[in-house]
C-alpha cells in the first residue's frame, strides 16, 4: 500500500512538473507570438531612425574629404606656380643686372638707327601704363602742360632729347630784322593807298 501511495505521489508530482513546463512553454510561445512583431517593429524603427543619421554622417564625411582634397590641390597648384615664378624670375635677373652694370659704367646700348638709349627708357613706358590709363594728353588732371610724345605714344625713340632746331635766319641781326619789318609796313601802306586811289578813280568814271 505504501509503495502504491509513493508511486502515485511520484506520478502526480511528475504530472505537475510536466504541466508546469508545458504551461511555461505555452506562455513563452504566447509572448513570442504577441511581442515578436512589436519588437521587430521597434527594431525596424530604430534602424530607420539611425539610417538618416548615418547617411548624414557619411555625407558630411564625404564633403569634408572632398574639401580637403580640393584644398590640397589648390595648395599644390599655388606652390607649383610660385616655384615656376621663381624659376622664371631667376634667369631674367641676369640681363637686368648686366644693364645696371652698363648704366653704372656710363655706357648705353646703340640701336639700329644709331640712337643710343639706356634701359631706363624701357622701364618708363611700363610706369606710364600704370599711371596714365585715362589716355588724356596732359601730364596731370590739374595741369595745363602737355604730356611728352614719348609718354603719350609709349615710344622710347620719341622720349629722346633731340637737339634744338636751328633757326634758318640765325645770322640776321636785329637791325636788319627791323629794317625788313619797316619795309614791309611801308609796302603794305603803299598797297592800301594804291587800292584806295583805284576805287576813287572807278567812282569818278
UniProtKB/Swiss-Prot annotation:
Biased composition (Polar residues): 71-108
Localization (cell): Nucleus
Keyword Nucleus among record annotations: yes
Biased composition range(s): Basic residues: 1-18
Keywords: Nucleus
Pfam family, any one: UPF0688
UniProt biased composition (Basic and acidic residues): 46-63
Annotated region (Disordered), positions in chain: 1-128, 184-205
One Gene Ontology cellular component: nucleus
Disulfide bonding pattern of the chain: none
Keyword Phosphoprotein found: no
Biased composition (Acidic residues): 187-196
Family per record: Belongs to the UPF0688 family.
Protein name: UPF0688 protein C1orf174 homolog
Naturally occurring in which organism (per UniProt): Xenopus laevis
Amino acid at each position: 500500500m505504501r509503495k502504491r501511495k509513493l508511486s502515485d505521489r511520484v506520478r502526480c508530482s511528475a504530472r505537475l512538473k510536466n504541466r508546469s513546463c508545458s504551461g511555461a512553454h505555452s506562455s513563452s510561445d504566447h509572448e513570442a507570438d504577441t511581442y515578436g512583431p512589436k519588437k521587430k517593429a521597434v527594431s525596424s524603427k530604430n534602424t530607420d531612425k539611425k539610417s538618416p543619421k548615418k547617411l548624414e554622417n557619411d555625407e558630411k564625411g564625404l564633403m569634408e574629404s572632398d574639401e580637403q582634397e580640393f584644398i590640397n590641390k589648390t595648395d599644390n597648384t599655388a606652390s607649383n606656380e610660385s616655384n615656376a615664378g621663381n624659376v622664371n624670375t631667376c634667369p631674367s635677373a641676369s640681363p637686368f643686372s648686366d644693364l645696371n652694370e652698363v648704366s653704372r659704367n656710363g655706357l648705353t646700348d646703340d640701336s639700329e638707327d644709331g640712337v643710343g638709349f639706356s634701359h631706363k627708357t624701357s622701364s618708363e613706358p611700363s610706369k606710364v601704363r600704370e599711371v596714365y590709363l585715362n589716355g588724356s594728353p596732359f601730364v596731370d588732371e590739374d595741369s595745363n602742360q602737355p604730356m611728352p610724345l614719348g609718354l603719350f605714344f609709349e615710344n622710347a625713340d620719341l622720349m629722346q632729347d633731340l637737339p634744338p632746331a636751328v633757326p634758318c635766319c640765325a645770322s640776321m641781326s636785329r637791325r636788319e630784322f627791323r629794317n625788313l619789318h619797316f619795309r614791309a609796313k611801308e609796302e603794305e601802306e603803299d598797297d592800301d593807298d594804291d587800292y584806295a586811289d583805284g576805287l576813287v578813280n572807278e567812282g569818278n568814271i
